[in-house]
């Protein structure tokens, strides 16, 4: 571990990449030195606060080490400090990985609505979660959120999304009803 730390420190000095703080912190964590690890993790997140362009690199480094809360905080700070950055997708998936499925659903649906070109990516991620959902708890939560959105906004987008969900659940009659309502509005 000491050799690894020396190597990481020398690489950090040569390249001045704050992503090495994540590696150094993880090395300390493996040595059961959580205080030292947290110190390095804080330095990595502080680097994002000072230079938001590092957010993706450092967020990914945290994700690769399964440090989900730190990754979420990194993306959040990067997005807050640079409004042109959008990490809503990554943050939504992290919420799902942390077990906050309802929050993930809301964030993914918001993201797909504001970035229509990414709807297919969002749907693919939702399918992955539905495949692991033997009791349909996740699918029912998704359906509930989509039904609320179709009632609140009357936007065809939500009817199309709901139709997609029904097709994935092999509820073709319900999907057909959604498609008919879309057709009548056009």
List PLM regions with ranges.
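Structural motif corresponding to the intra-repeat A-B loop/turn of tetratricopeptide repeats
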Residues: 31, 65, 98, 129, ...
């Amino acid at each position: 571990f000491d050799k690894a730390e020396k190597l990481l420190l020398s690489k950090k000095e040569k390249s001045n990449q704050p992503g090495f703080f994540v590696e150094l912190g993880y090395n300390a964590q493996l040595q059961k030195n959580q205080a030292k690890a947290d110190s390095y993790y804080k330095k990595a997140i502080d680097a994002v606060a000072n230079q938001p362009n590092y957010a993706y690199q450092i967020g990914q480094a945290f994700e690769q080490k399964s440090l989900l809360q730190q990754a979420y905080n990194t993306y959040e700070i990067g997005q807050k400090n640079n409004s042109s950055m959008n990490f809503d997708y990554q943050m939504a998936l992290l919420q799902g990985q942390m077990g906050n499925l309802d929050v993930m659903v809301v964030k993914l649906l918001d993201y797909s609505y504001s970035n229509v070109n990414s709807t297919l990516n969002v749907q693919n991620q939702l399918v992955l979660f539905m495949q692991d959902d033997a009791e349909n708890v996740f699918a029912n939560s998704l359906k509930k959120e989509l039904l609320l959105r179709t009632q609140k906004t009357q936007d065809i987008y939500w009817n199309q999304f709901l139709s997609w969900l029904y097709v994935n659940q092999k509820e073709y009659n319900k999907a057909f009803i959604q498609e008919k309502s879309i057709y009548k509005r056009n």
